[in-house]
Regions:
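Oxyanion-binding "anion nests"
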Residues: 49, 56-98
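Residues that define the transmembrane beta-barrel architecture of outer-membrane proteins
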Residues: 26-30, 71-75, 101-105, 135-139, ...
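Aromatic- and glycine-enriched pocket-lining scaffold segments that form the walls
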Residues: 1-43, 47
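Transmembrane beta-strands of outer-membrane beta-barrel pores
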Residues: 13-17, 48-54, 83-85, 92-96, ...
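Outer membrane beta-barrel transmembrane domains
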Residues: 110, 116-154
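Outer-membrane beta-barrel architecture
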Residues: 33-35, 76-80, 108-110, 142, ...
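Repeated loop/turn-to-beta-strand initiation elements of outer-membrane beta-barrel proteins
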Residues: 5-9, 40-45, 85-90, 116-120, ...
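Outer-membrane beta-barrel "beta-signal"
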Residues: 36, 145-146, 167-179
């Protein structure tokens, strides 16, 4: 944290295919993040990653084939705000894998309606391939009960609308225990 606790940043040089998996290429990726803390509970953030990916399978969304090293770049800007018992967050992101451009945006609102009980709503848009317009939108509404710090019971309904595939609806429940 720098400048009177108003700025956070991170920068890294990375190499790897994932946890416990040897990297299949020699290139390094660079990544960075910058957070600006404004007016107490308002945050504006930006991040990026620039590097090379190694395809472990053929892509469903573009012409990247198994074993191919390809350009993998991402950037995002976002903001979050908390006021009393309400928290909101939104983020916009773009990516480029080889020559395929993608984009996404989401918004999330969480509001405490009773002690330890919160309502959650979100909208999530993803365009996996801007050229073919491979788009999906997810609408999510739910409730969660925090029965212990970092432990919750959650239920939510999701409606997923796909442009190139069928739509879907999901009703799910989750128990989260963290220590």
């Amino acid at each position: 944290m720098l400048i009177n606790k108003k700025i956070d940043y991170a920068f890294s040089v990375q190499n790897g295919q994932g946890i416990n998996t040897k990297d299949k290429n020699k290139q390094k990726d660079i990544a960075g993040k910058l957070d600006l803390h404004l007016l107490g509970s308002w945050l504006i953030s930006g991040s990026f990653i620039k590097g090379k990916g190694y395809a472990i399978a053929d892509s469903r969304y573009n012409d990247i084939k198994t074993g191919e090293n390809y350009r993998r770049n991402r950037w995002s800007v976002g903001s979050s705000f908390a006021y009393k018992k309400m928290h909101a967050r939104a983020e916009y992101m773009e990516g480029k894998d080889k020559s395929t451009r993608s984009q996404g945006v989401y918004g999330l609102v969480c509001c405490e309606i009773l002690p330890k009980v919160e309502l959650i709503g979100s909208v999530d848009f993803l365009n996996r391939n801007k050229e073919t317009k491979d788009k999906q939108v997810m609408y999510i509404g739910g409730v969660q009960y925090w029965f212990y710090p970092k432990c919750r019971l959650a239920a939510q309904y999701t409606y997923q609308k796909e442009k190139l595939r069928g739509n879907a609806q999901v009703l799910q429940a989750q128990l989260q225990v963290s220590f």
